[in-house]
Amino acid sequence: MKQPFLISFFVLLCSTGIWAQSNPTTPFMPAPKANFEKIGVNTPNQAAPPLFAGSLEEALTHAFDSIVALSPIKGFTAAVLMPDGNVWKKASGVSQELPSSLPLTTDHLMGMGSISKSFVSVTLLKMVDAGLLSLDDKISKYLDPYPNINGEATVRQVLSHRTGFNDYINENPAMNAALVQNLDSIWEIDTLLSHYVLAPNFPLNTDWSYSNTNFLLAGRLIEKISGKTWYEAVREQVLTPLGLTHTFAYPFETPGAQPFAHCFSDQDGDNVVDDLQGVGIPDEGLFSLATSAGCFITTPEDLVRFSERVHGGHVLNASTLAAMQTDFAQNPSTGLAYGLGAMQYTTLGIENWGHNGSLIYNSNAFYFPTENMAIAVQQNDERLWSPTAQIVDGDIVFLSLIVAYLDYKQATATYENNLDVQTIISPNPAQGQFNLLSSGLEQDEVEVSVVNALGATVVRQQFPVVNQQLNAQIDLSTQASGVYYVQVRDAQKVRVVQKVMLCK
């Protein structure tokens, strides 16, 4: 068996500064990758089957098939909950390669990573609704002391990552070393809190820092108040009432006969991802170490139903949901706002609420209030988009589905079969100006717009198309460093959405 080394858990460590936080001594970023931060997508693509514009479901299927055809990722699953309550869902790829290759289906479970935090937060907030505790209670009211944990922290500060507590996973190398030596162990929350949390990064409520440790504490609060294990309480308060029959706190709960997709990770540094369960690497240690901060497994269909029920106002009291969505810390450079166990983004100008997460598997699940629509995408492969490895990952699939949904809604939108638009942006990252080259365009003129992470359009220009080719120079020299999205639109619809990073 290959010697495993586990490189990443929930939190994406971002060297580009996109997620930079104000405390320079704690350069650890919220995990969960942003659902709009890795966009480098040309849609639709010739590899896709023809699109029939007769239904939204066909439009989504075309977008999904178009983009996953370009990806080396082993498997994707996706779901969209429509305003009428119907769910579109699709899968592509393999669920395992060893001992034999099997196709991935929409019934396969995958780890949701830090989306688990939203389930835990909602459970605790329902207890607030029931009068069992207050958001402004100090955690020392319910919990025994732990090393490096200030009992003066409030429930509100815990759920919104304003405690400054050290992240036991991403900021303590001893945790990773202990995990590698105990891959088949079942970790307990008290063990993790007692032995693997280092000194705080900053005093209470003076800054913001994403820390998985906060949601170990949230799990223990649930246990102390309910008298049940945290996952029993989540099932009783959230999973069962919402009919989420494909979601489990693994390995504390097991999925029975429901299929669990294998995860793929490069464990020996040869640039080839391995089927971890297929080669015999235990997963119990990793998932139990994540515990109430990230151990749930699920399907995209359960994720979209959860997202719509919670953020659509059907689970929590109005005042509690308002606190969840308005009591947040915000990063103005990225558009991220983190509330009480929930993230808020503005994606292509549209507000959405939810969470994302990574535990080798990668997941996004967000609800769009103005559309009354939810989207979830999961992948069973650790590989992500980066400036040096521009692969199609779950973030890009997620954005492709948003674009397909919005385009379908536009009264003037029409779809063409066998459209082949290829786009190159160079240099990328750019220092101020970049060249945009698109071929395969069929109109005589196109509009190029550049949108920042907050959804604001910073450039909008018309360019001629000569011999089906656009060759344009775009100037962002007056803009701040960050992530931008380039859209190429003709008279009918958006033809290209691609990400460019500006690094001055």
Language model region names:
Residues M1-P27, T414, N428, K504:
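Bacterial Sec-dependent N-terminal signal peptides
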Residues Q21-A91, E223-S226, R235-E236, G278-T423:
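Catalytic loop of the DD-peptidase/beta-lactamase superfamily, centered on the K-T-G motif
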Residues L70-T77, P99-Q157, F202-T213, T291, ...:
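Short active-site loop at a secondary-structure junction
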Residues K90-S92, Q378, Q461-Q462, Q498:
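Short hydrophobic alpha-helix segments
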Residues S92-Q96, N150-S358, N364:
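Short, surface-exposed loop or secondary-structure junction motifs
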Residues V94-P99, F287, E382-R383, F463-N467, ...:
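A short acidic/small-residue loop/turn micro-motif
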Residues G131, N271, P429:
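Acidic, glycine-anchored loop motifs typical of Ca2+
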Residues L419-S426, A430-K504:
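C-terminal outer-membrane/trafficking sorting elements
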